Amino acid sequence: AFSLRTSFSTRQLTELEKEFHFSRYLSRARRLEVARSLRLRDAQVKVWFQNRRMKQKKRERERWPDP
């Protein structure tokens, strides 16, 4: 079974980015709180953070390429 891709609103993205800026990892309790406040499922917030960490890692690799 697959799930449909989530389209986040501008407000949701802004809040998720703010949260990510504060901490790259969320505790389960905080994740549930964020999900509830943004009207998202816990799993959507979890996956967004996983993807955002990978995006950050990629940006850092591009900025500092291996010699």
From Swiss-Prot:
The keyword Nucleus applies. It is found in: Nucleus. Residues 1-60 bind DNA. One of its GO terms (cellular component) is nucleus. SUPFAM superfamilies: Homeodomain-like. Keywords: Developmental protein, DNA-binding, Homeobox, Nucleus, Transcription, Transcription regulation. It comes from the Eukaryota. The keyword tRNA-binding does not apply. One of its GO terms (molecular function) is sequence-specific DNA binding. CDD domains: homeodomain (cd00086). PROSITE patterns: HOMEOBOX_1 (PS00027), HOMEOBOX_2 (PS50071). Sequence-specific transcription factor which is part of a developmental regulatory system that provides cells with specific positional identities on the anterior-posterior axis. Belongs to the Antp homeobox family. Labial subfamily. This is Homeobox protein Hox-D1.
